[in-house]
Amino acid sequence: MQQTYKPNTSALKDGAPKATVDQKQLLPCKYRVGRVLGGGTYATVREAVHIETNKMYAAKIMNKKMMEKKQDFVKNEIAILKRVSYEHPNILHLVDFFETVNNLYLITELATGGELFDRICAKGSFYEADAAALMRTTTSAVKYLHDNGIVHRDLKPENLLYRSKDPNSDLLIADFGLSHFYEDSQYYMLMTACGTPEYMAPEVFRRTGYGKPVDMWAIGVITYFLLSGYTPFARPSQVEVIEAILANEYTFNDPCWSGISETAKDFIKKCLENDPSKRLTAADALKHPFLSEKRPATSNLLPNVRENFNARKTFRTAYNAVRAFNTWKKLENKH
């Protein structure tokens, strides 16, 4: 069966890499897809090579039938990427988007440098100044999103990718699948609970409405994670995570925090302010001494960060195994 190609070339800005060739060309002749990079309930992300130019991209492939009631999310993601692509060096670029009879395709640049935390762990050292530089870059990109009326809603280390393996590669904010337009002038408050629980702000769980401050809460959680190797509200179960977030229960009591400056802790506290109206804005965060001033020399944080991360990962694996076993025993006893 011949597949219909519906080009949307308005996504491409002047000067952007052109993935589109002959507009009459039919899919699947335009791109050749390769290995799977990731996926979820509604989409698969694969490597894609443009046949004409041989350039590599990432293709987010969404089955129309599976997305039947979720197509607004796709349109929203495309609209957001169209607004911000190519205007900021630290935001993943949209290259093209189109549809076939069965699928929707979203083509973006291929970030080959890996995830933020993996890059950190592969290094021989990591200092507070390195964490500050990374968060300065990320906060600058978040400010750009907010200035353009966009809330990301799913900021976390897994969505911070390096453009290439080059040591000086740009760090990119990726995955705008949960992002949303938000105009302050409309006094519109988002209500949908979405994101990754450990990085979600308390107002999201309260269902009282939320906006741009949720991204700054996530900035605080990410900063805490980079400096320690664990998130501030890490708990054995998701229910306990949510309870800790709502109660704003976190500390700097672990020995790993003894070598972290009070300036860094103050930055985290102001991002993790329970009241969103008192939380740092992206603009204010960039003026905070942690991001705006040169950080003092500190000891290498990497050994502690690695140790804490691996210890909690092992604990969580064991906890999940015990929980699965107990669930299985309950089911077995019912029969």
From Swiss-Prot:
Binding site for ATP: L37, G38, G39, G40, T41, Y42, A43, T44, V45
Top-level enzyme category: transferase
Entry superkingdom: Eukaryota
Name the record gives this protein: Calcium/calmodulin-dependent protein kinase type I
Species assigned in the record: Schizosaccharomyces pombe (strain 972 / ATCC 24843) (Fission yeast)
Residue ranges of domain Protein kinase in the record: 31-291
Active site: D154 (proton acceptor)
CDD domains named in the record: STKc_CAMK (cd05117)
Record-linked InterPro entries: Kinase-like_dom_sf, Prot_kinase_dom, Protein_kinase_ATP_BS, Ser/Thr_kinase_AS
Pfam families xrefs: Pkinase (PF00069)
Catalytic activity, reaction form: L-seryl-[protein] + ATP = O-phospho-L-seryl-[protein] + ADP + H(+); L-threonyl-[protein] + ATP = O-phospho-L-threonyl-[protein] + ADP + H(+)
Keywords: ATP-binding, Calmodulin-binding, Cytoplasm, Kinase, Nucleotide-binding, Phosphoprotein, Serine/threonine-protein kinase, Transferase
Coiled-coil regions listed: none
GO cellular component, one term: cytosol
Gene3D superfamilies in UniProt: Phosphorylase Kinase, domain 1 (3.30.200.20), Transferase(Phosphotransferase) domain 1 (1.10.510.10)
Annotated region (Calmodulin-binding), positions in chain: 310-334
Function text: Important in cell cycle regulation.
PTM annotation (Phosphothreonine): residues: T192
Subcellular location: Cytoplasm
Single biological process term from Gene Ontology: negative regulation of calcineurin-mediated signaling
The UniProt record lists the keyword Metal-binding: no
Enzyme Commission number(s): 2.7.11.17
Family statement: Belongs to the protein kinase superfamily. CAMK Ser/Thr protein kinase family. CaMK subfamily.
GO MF term list: ATP binding; calcium/calmodulin-dependent protein kinase activity; calmodulin binding; protein kinase activity; protein serine kinase activity
